[in-house]
């Protein structure tokens, strides 16, 4: 076993020194001086590192860029002043009391090397390497470039049965500083052929990675996650500086790009790239570049809010962080670290290969268990599964309506608040959704980007194009579960269902009359305003609806474009053709819920329902007599305006209805 040096038992702080309070700094000072005394009493090299000399004079060590453990060779035992140091018990009690007040946080990163008292067996000369002289007698430090085990300690609340103090081990390479490399050259010159380090296996990035579980990760704030990112990038750079070939893992690319910890679905930590192969020389930035940029932050220059600290010298392009600067340098240089072998597309990070490979190969690894529909991403599968379960997790607190997605709930809340944040810059009309604003703006520009491939007709909305295409294919995918009637659009099915439920959600503010659709309500409002928009060019009749005008125009032209395929009879309106088609099929989709009697037309069902309710909604204004049908009321009114005399031969008959007998005088 080799001799134990001061570096083996030292507690090294890098960026964590600022997180320590005065009690912990004093504890660190006492601990390092105590280790020096212990090593001196065991016959360790009689030299005191410069950082310990400064610890004896002040409570803080050098900064990271200057705080290298340097062996100066100056006698130091006489300079120790233990009476100036506080009691170990007092420091521990004070530190423990402060620990209880600290919240969850990443506050320490120390090298955990067992002290001399904690070793199972004391060091003997037989355990040391077979050397003729101790290493310090040859004028060298006896240190070697070894992998020191580090541990990140995170206090988090208890998760189940787990210990609230969670620790993850990792190995971080302790690089030889410049002064140590000079001593090694001198050592090799004085003792050629002398072994200075034991043989070790190659260390991969997976060996030095610190991994947190998702439960642990959520308890870290932004400062702690930033510290974690810096530690991981430092580990990688240290490995890259000593390894001949080291490919950047996919997870590290995510870490550089987002500053977030990777998850298991992003890839396993590995020292080799997944297919396709990666070029290590292009994937690893130079250590000089890292040192140059890191020195900016070490000097204490803090960017102001909104200021971009890092600049690329080639184009003076500013950057907020280090990682985009490296990526920009590679983009400017035209480098590409990874290349897809099949489609020959190059990517700067190997993780970017995932999406092109899925698109190219059509990989859809997430399949639905119910309909066997597959998706590329798990988030799409979760969203799709809600269509089967009909799960509506997001409830409106005002009206109780439930929605499947939170975005739909947010849009719905605007109907209660009346908020319309999206306003047209030309006409000032406002909308609740940005998509509706985009569609509205096409009315001003006349843009119709959606064109039918069959007939060339263009539309300004994709939904209008889809509905139009179904007129060519004859597809009616939306079918009523009660009567079996099919529709081309889902909105038409929703309107049709109100004929079964008798729901009329749209009510007139002036007279209170309800309607099934908003279109019918808008038409009704014109009765109060007297507005009539559509005028017949032939007879001058003004109509309130465009569809009514089209039907009216056919009375002048005699056009009957709707022909029955069975008997050849033609009709001027599609509704008349549908009613006629039921005479051939015998289909009666409208059934009475009380007696079960079925009818071929909804109007016949409405009239029949009044026989059960004894409702007579049509009342005469003069005699207040009520009728079930409007036609009966019309016939009744003729008795008040006078009798119509129809002569049949010489016998005058007073008739008010063609099916009624003669009325008494």
Swiss-Prot record:
CDD domains: KRAB_A-box. GO terms for molecular function: DNA-binding transcription factor activity, RNA polymerase II-specific; RNA polymerase II cis-regulatory region sequence-specific DNA binding; zinc ion binding. Residues 4-74, 203-274 form the KRAB domain. Highly expressed in heart. It is found in: Nucleus. Keywords: DNA-binding, Metal-binding, Nucleus, Repeat, Transcription, Transcription regulation, Zinc, Zinc-finger. GO terms for biological process: regulation of transcription by RNA polymerase II. Pfam families: KRAB, zf-C2H2, zf-H2C2_2. PROSITE patterns: KRAB (PS50805), ZINC_FINGER_C2H2_1 (PS00028), ZINC_FINGER_C2H2_2 (PS50157). A zinc finger (C2H2-type) spans 366-388, 394-416, 422-444, 450-472, 478-500, 506-528, 534-556, 562-584, 590-612, 618-640. Coiled coil: none annotated. Its main location: nucleus. GO terms for cellular component: nucleus. May be involved in transcriptional regulation. Belongs to the krueppel C2H2-type zinc-finger protein family. This is Zinc finger protein 333.
């Amino acid at each position: 076993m080799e001799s134990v040096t001061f570096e083996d038992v030292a507690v090294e702080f890098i960026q964590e020194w600022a997180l320590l309070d005065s009690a912990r700094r004093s504890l660190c000072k006492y601990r390092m001086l105590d280790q020096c005394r212990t090593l001196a009493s065991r016959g360790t090299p009689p030299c005191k590192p410069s950082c310990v000399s400064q610890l004896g004079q002040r409570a803080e060590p050098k900064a990271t860029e200057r705080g290298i453990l340097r062996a100066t060779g100056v006698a130091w035992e006489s300079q120790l002043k233990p009476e100036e140091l506080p009691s170990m018990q007092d420091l521990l009690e004070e530190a423990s009391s402060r620990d209880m007040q600290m919240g969850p946080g990443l506050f320490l990163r120390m090298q955990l090397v067992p002290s001399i008292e904690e070793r199972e067996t004391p060091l003997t000369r037989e355990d040391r390497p077979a050397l003729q002289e101790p290493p310090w007698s040859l004028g060298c430090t006896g240190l070697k470039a070894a992998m020191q085990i580090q541990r990140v300690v995170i206090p988090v609340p208890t998760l189940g049965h787990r210990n609230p103090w969670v620790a993850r081990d990792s190995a971080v390479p302790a690089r030889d500083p410049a002064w140590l490399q000079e001593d090694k050259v001198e050592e090799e010159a004085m003792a050629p052929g002398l072994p200075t380090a034991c043989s070790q296996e190659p260390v991969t990035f997976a060996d030095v990675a610190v991994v947190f579980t998702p439960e642990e990760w959520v308890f870290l704030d932004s400062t702690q996650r930033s510290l974690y990112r810096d530690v991981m990038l430092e580990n990688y750079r240290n490995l890259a500086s000593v390894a001949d070939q080291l490919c950047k893992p996919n997870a590290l690319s995510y870490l550089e790009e987002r500053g977030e910890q990777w998850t298991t679905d992003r890839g396993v930590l590995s020292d080799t790239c997944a297919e396709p192969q990666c070029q290590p020389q292009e994937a690893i930035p130079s250590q000089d570049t890292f040192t140059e940029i890191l020195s900016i932050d070490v000097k204490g220059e803090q960017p102001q809010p909104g200021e971009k600290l890092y600049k690329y010298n080639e184009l003076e392009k500013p950057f907020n962080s280090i990682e985009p600067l490296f990526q920009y340098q590679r983009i400017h240089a035209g480098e590409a670290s990874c290349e897809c072998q099949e489609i020959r597309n190059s990517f700067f990070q190997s993780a970017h290969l995932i999406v092109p490979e899925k698109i190219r190969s059509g990989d859809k690894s997430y399949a639905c268990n119910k309909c066997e529909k597959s998706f590329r991403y798990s988030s799409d599968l979760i969203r799709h599964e809600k269509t089967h379960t009909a799960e509506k997790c997001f409830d409106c607190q005002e009206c109780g309506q439930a929605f499947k997605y939170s975005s739909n709930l947010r849009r719905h809340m605007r109907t209660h608040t009346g908020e319309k944040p999206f306003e047209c810059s030309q006409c000032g009309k406002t909308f609740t959704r940005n998509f509706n604003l985009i569609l509205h703006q096409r009315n001003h520009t006349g843009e119709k980007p959606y064109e039918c491939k069959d007939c060339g007709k263009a539309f300004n909305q994709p939904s209008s194009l889809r509905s139009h295409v179904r007129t060519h294919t004859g597809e009616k995918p939306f079918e009523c579960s009660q009567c079996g009637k099919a529709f081309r659009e889902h909105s038409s099915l929703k309107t049709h269902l109100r004929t079964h439920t008798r729901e009329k959600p749209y009510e007139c503010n002036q007279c209170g009359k309800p309607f099934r659709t908003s279109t019918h309500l808008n038409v009704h409002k014109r009765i109060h305003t007297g507005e009539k928009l559509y005028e017949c060019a032939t007879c001058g009749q003004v109509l309130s609806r465009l569809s009514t005008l089209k039907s009216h125009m056919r009375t002048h032209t005699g056009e009957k474009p709707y022909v029955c395929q069975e008997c050849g009879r033609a009709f001027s309106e599609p509704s008349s053709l549908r009613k006629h088609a039921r005479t051939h099929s015998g289909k009666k989709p409208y059934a009475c819920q009380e007696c079960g009697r079925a009818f071929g037309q909804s109007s016949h069902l409405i009239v029949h329902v009044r026989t059960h309710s004894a409702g007579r909604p049509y009342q005469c204004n003069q005699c207040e007599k009520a009728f079930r049908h409007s036609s009966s009321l019309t016939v009744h009114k003729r008795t008040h305006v006078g009798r119509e005399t129809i002569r049949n031969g010489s016998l005058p008959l007073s008739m008010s209805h063609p099916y009624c007998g003669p009325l008494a005088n």
